[in-house]
């Protein structure tokens, strides 16, 4: 039983669920563009997301300040799970990437470079990590579709980036105590702006997402921006951890389900 619980916890903490949500958002973007994602782009998105987030988990084992904290101590003691899933994710992404044009691969390598900066200089990037996360997600979800980059497509990419940033900002509130203990020199958005300003910034991102969705004719985007705003308003220092995980890990798939549920 303990072994089974350990594996369930490994899968949860290894962000398999985030990779599934990334795939859901990729499918949503395809529907907005009138395209159907094939297995190639799906492999890149799912495998790439799984690789990156497990690489971040695997990196923690070399950080003495972070690994000493009880929140990540379990991850450090089971780092081989993250290592295995990281390699599996890389293999899945590589299989899909083999069928993509060179021009698309070059852009994806730019995203990989941004992730490397985030991983290598985690303490130095501080508040910039939120922007890096949003930009990288937007690139990975949209670029594989090989677009001509019309105005609507550019606005869609901006909307996705803001949506991800809006989801990430509340998690900065959730992580502020851990960040202060594990990375005393790192100044995140919450450390620089304060909790209330961070919440307002997150809501501002969702307001812009709603406005861009209105312009692009995406009713589901307007609905999800309102839902996310409601969840963000409930965030504070004592908010249960499950609230943050549902907000971050559930809203991407929820957006796709809302899109499918609408009668048009």
Model-derived features: positions:
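Intramembrane alpha-helical segments
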Residues: 73-146, 232-234
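Functional transmembrane core segments of multi-pass inner-membrane proteins
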Residues: 133-178
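Solvent-exposed interhelical
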Residues: 45, 49-84, 165-206
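C-terminal ends of transmembrane helices
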Residues: 5, 53-66, 114-129, 173-178, ...
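Membrane-embedded alpha-helical segments that form the functional core of polytopic membrane enzymes
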Residues: 37-55, 107-113, 152-170
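Extended hydrophobic alpha-helices typical of membrane-associated regions
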Residues: 69-71, 222-264
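Helix-coil boundary and interhelical linker segments in multi-pass alpha-helical membrane proteins
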Residues: 24-45, 93-106, 141-158, 210-219, ...
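Small-residue-rich segments of transmembrane alpha-helices in multi-pass membrane proteins
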Residues: 20-25, 73-85, 131-147, 190-198, ...
């Amino acid at each position: 039983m303990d072994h089974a619980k350990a594996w369930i916890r490994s899968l949860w903490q290894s962000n398999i669920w985030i990779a599934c949500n990334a795939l859901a958002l990729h499918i949503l973007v395809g529907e907005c563009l009138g395209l159907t994602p094939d297995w190639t782009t799906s492999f890149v998105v799912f495998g790439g997301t799984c690789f990156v987030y497990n690489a971040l988990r695997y990196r923690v084992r070399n950080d003495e300040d972070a690994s000493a904290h009880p929140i990540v101590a379990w991850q450090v003691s089971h780092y081989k799970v993250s290592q295995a899933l990281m390699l599996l994710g890389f293999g899945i992404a590589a299989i899909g990437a083999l069928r993509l044009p060179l021009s698309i691969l070059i852009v994806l390598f730019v995203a990989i470079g941004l992730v490397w900066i985030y991983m290598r200089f985690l303490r130095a990037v501080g508040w910039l990590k939120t922007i890096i996360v949003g930009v990288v997600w937007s690139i990975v979800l949209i670029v594989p579709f090989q677009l001509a980059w019309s105005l609507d497509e550019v606005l869609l990419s901006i909307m996705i980036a803001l949506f991800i940033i809006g989801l990430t900002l509340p998690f900065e509130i959730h992580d502020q105590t851990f960040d202060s203990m594990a990375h005393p020199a790192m100044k995140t958005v919450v450390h620089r702006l304060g909790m209330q300003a961070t919440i307002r910034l997150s809501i501002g991102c969702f307001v812009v997402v709603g406005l861009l969705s209105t312009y692009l004719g995406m009713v589901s985007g307007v609905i999800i921006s309102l839902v996310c705003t409601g969840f963000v308003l409930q965030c504070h220092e004592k908010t249960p951890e499950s609230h943050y995980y549902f907000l971050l890990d559930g809203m991407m798939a929820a957006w796709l389900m809302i899109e499918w549920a609408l009668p048009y």
